[in-house]
From Swiss-Prot:
One of its GO terms (cellular component) is fungal-type vacuole. Disulfide bonds join 179-419, 313-327, 337-360, 344-353, 382-389. InterPro entries: AB_hydrolase_fold (IPR029058), Peptidase_S10 (IPR001563), Propeptide_carboxypepY (IPR008442), Ser_caboxypep_ser_AS (IPR018202). This is Carboxypeptidase Y homolog A. Glycans are attached at residues 210, 509.
Length: 543
């Protein structure tokens, strides 16, 4: 979850949106692109109820600086579409949709469910030797095109280093919202990292050691993805992911028969319940979904926001970052914050959920941010504010902006950004941030195992909050799961056998792991422990 001060501040309901104040100096085309959403926003402000206006005005009173920040709508990325001849395969959704089969009772039915007519999948076999990333491992890159809505999602597939004919397939998603999954590829769990010389370095602990992995830049206008339109909530993005997987497995049926898992971190705590539910809602599908893994996620804000104060004030296993006065201030703000989140849960209205995000983030995350401590790791200061505290993220961006890299993978955009904060704000202004996506998890547990894991040094999506929401979740196994004790998690698969790497509790299809010494990005901080639990999870040890 990416939180910057600008992300947390917006104008109150009574503040007029100055005409194009945000886009002075932009070409007229850019102004035209923004005029309609800004006009729509102004019109919607006029329709607010008195209660909603009071709520927004209260936020403005507490955080007057927010009056200076109005909604930002993302401009399209500059791009040049490559000709069809560039691609080795183009899978037409309309062709897939047109395939009918005979059902068990002799009736005609579509081979796969879903509305796929508007989608195409473009595929290029990428030469591993061209970039020196996992030489000898089969790779595909390309785009999922939603031709109806002018959306183009970039993906990068790496085959398993081990036994690709039998190893499972995993979709990896970074969060944000609005951050590229290529960050996960090169900073965390992919086959290579990028060093200070902007060169790829082989990763011994890559997750494609025993699984094939797809890294997806979503939603649109993130990483190498682009669009003339925008996605501003999690549900809208779910349709695209289902289409991508359906067309990919149609082109490569050898992977479709393998077990499939979805993994991700941070705001993927929103994405994954929705994406998995979307997949499972289609009874006729070619996606063999077996489990989901959510790392340091934001899934149940009402429960998780309870635990910012304890984590910041010394109750999470690390020394306090804040002084007593700041901790007391957070305690004082919590009841109002929780009341606002409850209202969001009850209505799921943007006009209620947006003020909850602004108030709670300023009151409960803001005090920590102002210390200069890394929100993704309580153990140290933010070392590079321009790259979300990590110099390595800057190395990744510099590498992915190289012309030869973009050419090798078939990227169609003129540049790469690790995170698009316009997207971040769009999701916030749609009210998506505080919505109760955890309510989808019981439905998942009825069909597949769910793993919640958390590096215990993270503040922003900390282990205390993730453990708490998993225990508070209402499902048939809640009592047994909540009462289960944390047990030691130790290495079993290499020469460090017996080394304690964390704690685990599990019942039925639900499992929680605390990973020692991991921040927000566990595979980066604890690569050995990360690969250990990942291999054992996809191997079915806990389900």
């Amino acid at each position: 979850m990416r939180v910057l001060p600008a992300t947390l501040l917006v104008g109150a309901a009574t503040a007029a949106v100055p005409p194009f104040q945000q886009i002075l100096g932009l070409p007229k085309k850019g102004a035209d692109t923004l005029s309609k959403p800004l006009h729509d926003f102004q019109e919607q402000l006029k329709t607010l109820s008195d209660d909603a206006r009071r709520l927004w005005d209260e936020v403005a009173k507490h955080f007057p600086d927010s009056m200076d920040h109005n909604p930002v709508f993302s401009l399209p990325k500059k791009h040049t579409r490559r000709p069809d001849s560039h691609w080795d395969h183009i899978v037409r959704g309309a062709d897939v949709q047109s395939v009918w089969v005979t059902g068990a009772n002799g009736e005609k039915e579509r081979e796969v469910d879903g509305k796929l007519e508007a989608y195409d999948l473009r595929v290029k076999t990428t030469d591993p030797g061209a970039l020196g990333i996992d030489p000898g491992v089969k790779q595909y890159t390309g785009y999922l095109d939603d031709n109806e809505n002018d959306k183009h999602l970039f993906y990068w597939f790496f085959e398993s280093r081990n036994d690709p004919k039998n190893d499972p397939v995993v979709l990896w998603l970074n969060g944000g919202p609005g951050c590229s999954s290529l960050t996960g590829l090169f900073l965390e769990l992919g086959p290579s990292s990028i060093d200070s010389k902007i060169k790829p370095v082989y990763n011994d602990f890559a997750w494609n050691s025993n699984a094939s992995v797809i890294f997806l830049d979503q939603p649109v206008n993130v990483g190498y993805s682009y669009s003339g339109s925008a996605v501003s909530d999690t549900v809208a993005a779910g349709k695209d992911v289902y289409a991508l997987l359906t067309l990919f497995f149609k082109q490569f049926p050898e992977y479709a028969k393998q077990d499939f898992h979805i993994a991700g971190e941070s705001y993927a705590g929103h994405y994954i319940p929705v994406f998995a539910s979307e997949i499972l809602s289609h009874k006729k599908r070619n996606i063999n979904l077996k489990s989901v893994l959510i790392g340091n996620g934001l899934t149940d804000p009402l429960t998780q926001y309870d635990h910012y104060r304890p984590m910041a004030c010394g109750d999470g296993g690390y020394p306090a970052v804040l002084d007593e006065a700041s901790c007391q201030s957070m305690d004082n703000a919590l009841p109002r914050c929780k009341s606002m989140i409850e209202s969001c849960y009850n209505t799921e209205s943007s006009w209620v959920c947006v003020p909850a995000s602004i108030y709670c983030n300023n009151a409960l995350i803001g005090p920590y941010q102002r210390t200069g401590q890394n929100v993704y790791d309580v153990r140290g200061k933010c070392e590079d504010e321009s790259n979300l505290c990590y110099k390595g993220m800057g190395y990744v961006s510099e590498y992915l902006n190289k012309r030869e890299v973009r050419e090798a993978v078939g990227a169609e955009v003129d540049g790469y950004d690790s995170c698009n904060f316009d997207i971040n704000r769009n999701f916030l202004f749609h009210g998506d941030w505080m919505k109760p996506y955890h309510r989808l998890v019981p439905g998942l547990l009825e069909q597949i195992p769910v793993l919640i894991y958390a590096g215990d040094a993270d503040f922003i999506c900390n282990w205390l909050g993730n453990k708490a929401w998993s225990e508070a979740l209402e499902w048939p196994g809640q009592k047994e799961y909540a009462s289960a004790e944390l047990e030691d998690l130790v290495i079993e698969q290499n020469e460090h056998q017996g080394k304690k790497i964390g704690q685990i509790k599990s019942h039925g299809n639900f499992t929680f792991m605390r990973l020692y010494g991991g921040g927000h990005m566990v595979p980066m901080d604890q690569p050995e422990a990360s690969l250990e639990f990942f291999n054992r999870w996809i191997g079915g040890e806990w389900f």
